[in-house]
């Protein structure tokens, strides 16, 4: 994992626990994620370790701290199996209603990869007594693991899983003085 992630060390803000990491920690009392993050940080990174689920706030300053905007994200490693028809798309709306303050929602676990920006919600500003609509980005983080290969053997083949799109995501934030997203434009693009 270290050799794979090392070229991207300056682009990784945080890495969270997954079911494999928590099982190794539970059964062997070894925190392999802390080891990985220490290696990345020793290579010039500033990676923070996250738990299985949680929140991150990214704060952006404009003109030497005179003005700032933030993006709130909710992450959860994920759960469940390989939904053959929906590929987990139904969870997108449920998560948006469950975490209405999150600008971006990250989910993983089942190795599906997609981005759904279609969930729009109303946000009420008590201080200004105004209502606005905001998009919530739902990101299934994907994986670089091809568990099916040629489809002849392996755990995923035995369980009848469908092929998944490989790769991850890059998220670019651009601070603009005028924008519909609170001064920040979000661009989400595939990392393959």
What name fits each language-model region?
Residues 1-192:
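Extended recognition/assembly regions associated with phosphoester-bond processing machinery
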């Amino acid at each position: 994992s270290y050799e794979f992630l090392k070229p991207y060390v300056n682009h990784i803000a945080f890495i969270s626990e997954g079911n494999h990491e928590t099982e190794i920690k539970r059964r062997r009392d070894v925190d392999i994620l802390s080891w990985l993050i220490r290696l990345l940080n020793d290579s010039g990174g500033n990676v923070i370790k996250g738990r299985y689920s949680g929140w991150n706030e990214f704060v952006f300053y404009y003109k030497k701290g005179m003005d700032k905007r933030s993006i709130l994200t909710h992450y959860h490693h994920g759960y469940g199996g390989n939904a053959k028809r929906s590929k987990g798309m139904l969870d997108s709306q449920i998560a948006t209603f469950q975490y209405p303050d999150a600008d971006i929602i990250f989910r993983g676990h089942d190795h599906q990869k997609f981005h759904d920006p279609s969930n729009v919600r109303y946000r009420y500003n008590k201080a200004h007594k105004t209502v606005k609509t905001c998009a919530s980005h739902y990101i299934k983080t994907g994986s670089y693991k091809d568990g099916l290969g040629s489809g002849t053997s392996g755990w995923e083949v035995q369980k009848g899983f469908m092929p998944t799109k490989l790769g991850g995501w890059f998220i670019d934030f651009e601070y603009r003085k005028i924008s519909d997203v609170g001064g920040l434009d979000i661009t989400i693009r595939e990392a393959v």
